[in-house]
């Protein structure tokens, strides 16, 4: 991830002020579902993040209940929604907002993210905001403020209303209405 991404992060505001304890490990997550990516992507992402951050990390893997997850990874079993395929599995990212699976600050990366330099600056961002990379399809359109969900930083306890909103709707209706998870996130957490 290059330094320009730092300038392309959008923030979405809430009412509490919070920072990560500098002495605590950073909680980092990824999601692997179905056969779109093999396990080597998890290992590579873990390696990249570990090399490019100075804090110790806890690495969380959100995946199917029956998928084995070796140490040192922390497994979170996803609810099986029966969705599969390379363009549908991204809907499982909505479960990252379920604070019953993990509660607290969480830095999320898609499995195909490449981290190339130090990312310590991310954990210093104020957690009263929801932080995500700006949607790269619209980088040259300054009026567009939508996010790309490939890199996100937030406190799951403060944004669990996203999960509750997803649960309150019919999943098939959501999938048919929105192009992908980030469109729904953009609607539920409007840019401040």
Question: Would you name each region that the model predicts?
Answer:
Residues 59, 97, 112, 152, ...:
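A residue-level signal for conserved active-site and pocket-lining positions in enzyme catalytic cores
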